[in-house]
From Swiss-Prot:
Higher taxonomy: Eukaryota, Fungi, Dikarya, Ascomycota, Pezizomycotina
Chain positions covered by the region annotation Disordered: 52-135, 275-331, 416-471, 509-540
UniProt-annotated location(s): Endoplasmic reticulum membrane
Full protein name: Maintenance of mitochondrial morphology protein 1
Basic residues bias: start-end ranges: 122-132
Native source species: Blastomyces gilchristii (strain SLH14081) (Blastomyces dermatitidis)
Length: 540
């Protein structure tokens, strides 16, 4: 019989008590969440914002040109103004710092380094030195200038039949000015005009500082090289030399001339002057005859009523949306003229002064034809006289130390000059290739014309008004004219006629007659000047 078991059962496990109670754990968890939220608010919401990307890039690109001030810094001499302070009526506009127009201050703020000039005794002017800044190529500027010149050429051709706004009328009026034309020269008739096909190329632009006693720290001047070559810019005229001794019209000598620009190159100087009065004294331009100014004023005053009437008719005649842009341009031009007329004479107006350095190059080609029965062609002395006169005309106007001063227009935004860009391409495509209705100079536009001219064998220009928006997409070669060359020939008056395949020299000398002239001015027309003419001779 088995005895009782000596085995003892193991003691039950002892339960460990937690070190923290449930309440304490809850408090610790809530506290940690609060700390995390507080840290997030402090470092992500109320923390300092990172610098702007553009400012970052600018600081990286111009690490050597650090600004010594910030937008929030206030200079020591200027007192801060709070919103609660009410300034007086005479102190609403804050004063401009005295160094705002200083040359060194402008160069420092624009990160441009220029070398000041040293005075020389020639013409009592300063000779500019090249700046230490890297010259610029001006490719973008060439594109803008080319578009502007192309627009002027196209507008001049469109307005060729206008009796008052055409370039032919302006040139004829300038060349036949009775106050400048000698008595021994008969009426000058323009027979051929070519506005060219190429565009000037600007390059190597640099900014220099020149000394100017009338401005603080001198003034800044931009120098750029310009070159125009292989262009077809020409003007052909015909007239007669009158021999008035011993009696009037004793003899008449027919003369025909054709002047072409072969190449022009030089250095263009551009600077801004404070106002017309100051610029006249500073730049010392040659005084112009008062008659020219009065004639121009009369021409502008004569055209102003037409501008006003055209502007009144414009809202009813414009058809396309992009016409508003051209109408706004014409209205802005008239508004600027009215604004300038209302400005007091004591208020200076910023002007643009430009000129060329004396080391320019102007190559001309002069063709001449003298006589009626026995004709002399390309007389060297005549070519020398004409070239010397053109060179003198150019130097008297835009060659240092003489400059041309042009007032800058008012560019403050106005509703009168506000326009809306329209889909002109779609409009022209829907018209089936026909001429758009918004071409300047046609019916339904603001027929604003600006006339210009030059004396002493100079030139002039006519710029047609807008009246219809931009001319984008309209090619000049698709309009039936060859290189913007306009050959004037009245009905049966013996002018120079040339066909599309005929050069200006061939038309001038009556040789190599081409066929297929357009508009009644065909290549079969022969050169005719007063007196009998033999058969045409081919020039070799």
């Amino acid at each position: 019989m088995a005895g009782p078991s000596n085995q003892t059962q193991p003691p039950p496990p002892v339960l460990t008590q937690p070190s923290l109670s449930f309440t304490q754990g809850l408090l610790v968890g809530q506290l940690s969440v609060v700390l995390l939220i507080g840290a997030f608010i402090k470092f992500f919401i109320f923390g300092e914002a990172p610098p702007h990307p553009s400012r970052n890039g600018l600081s990286n690109r111009t690490s050597s040109h650090r600004r010594s001030y910030s937008l929030n810094s206030i200079s020591a001499d200027s007192s801060p103004r709070t919103l609660r302070e009410k300034p007086s009526t005479s102190n609403i506009l804050r004063p401009v710092p005295s160094s705002s127009t200083n040359t060194r201050s402008i160069l420092r703020k624009t990160y441009y380094s220029a070398t000041p000039t040293n005075p020389t005794s020639k013409h009592s002017r300063s000779r500019p030195h090249h700046s230490s800044h890297q010259p610029e190529s001006l490719d973008w500027f060439n594109v803008l200038i080319a578009q502007t010149i192309a627009q002027y050429r196209q507008t001049a051709y469109i307005l060729k039949d206008s009796p008052t706004s055409s370039i032919l009328a302006s040139l004829s009026e300038a060349l036949n000015n009775p106050e400048k034309k000698p008595s021994f020269i008969d009426s000058i008739k323009v027979t051929d005009i070519s506005l060219g096909e190429e565009f000037p190329i600007f390059s190597n632009c640099r900014v220099i500082a020149v000394e100017d006693p009338n401005s603080d720290g001198g003034r800044l001047q931009a120098l750029m090289d310009v070159d125009l070559s292989d262009d077809n810019l020409s003007l052909a005229v015909e007239t007669s030399l009158l021999l008035n001794y011993p009696k009037p019209f004793s003899a008449v000598l027919p003369v025909a001339l054709a002047v072409s620009v072969v190449r022009f190159s030089g250095t263009l100087c551009i600077s801004f002057v404070p106002g017309p009065g100051t610029s006249d004294q500073t730049m010392s331009p040659s005084p112009s005859p008062p008659k020219e100014a009065s004639a121009e004023n009369i021409a502008v005053d004569h055209q102003s009523p037409e501008r006003q009437s055209a502007r009144q008719r414009a809202p009813h005649q414009h058809k396309y949306t992009n016409t508003n842009t051209a109408g706004a341009t014409a209205a802005a031009t008239a508004d600027d003229n009215d604004t300038h007329a209302k400005l007091p004479h004591g208020i200076p107006k910023t002007s643009l002064a430009f000129s060329f350095l004396p080391d320019y190059r102007l190559d001309l080609s002069v063709r001449s034809l003298i006589g009626s029965r026995s004709r002399l062609q390309d007389v060297p002395k005549v070519a020398q006289l004409v070239e010397a006169r053109v060179q003198a005309w150019f130097e008297e106007r835009v060659v240092e130390p003489r400059v041309q001063v042009v007032g800058l227009p008012n560019i403050w935004p106005r509703m009168g000059r506000t326009g809306v860009r329209g889909s002109q391409e779609e409009t022209e495509a829907g018209a089936g290739g026909s001429a758009p209705a918004d071409i300047p100079g046609t019916a339904g536009g603001d027929g604003v014309g600006v006339r210009g001219g030059g004396g002493g064998g100079g030139g002039g220009g006519g710029v047609g008004g807008s009246g219809g928006g931009s001319m984008r997409g309209t090619s000049g070669w698709g309009m039936g004219y060859d290189g913007l060359r306009y050959r004037h020939n009245a009905h049966g008056d013996g002018g120079v006629g040339a066909g599309p395949g005929q050069s200006a020299g061939a038309a001038l000398y009556g040789g190599a007659q081409g066929g297929g002239g357009g508009g009644g001015r065909g290549g079969e027309e022969q050169f005719a000047i007063p007196g009998s003419m033999p058969d045409p001779v081919v020039v070799t």
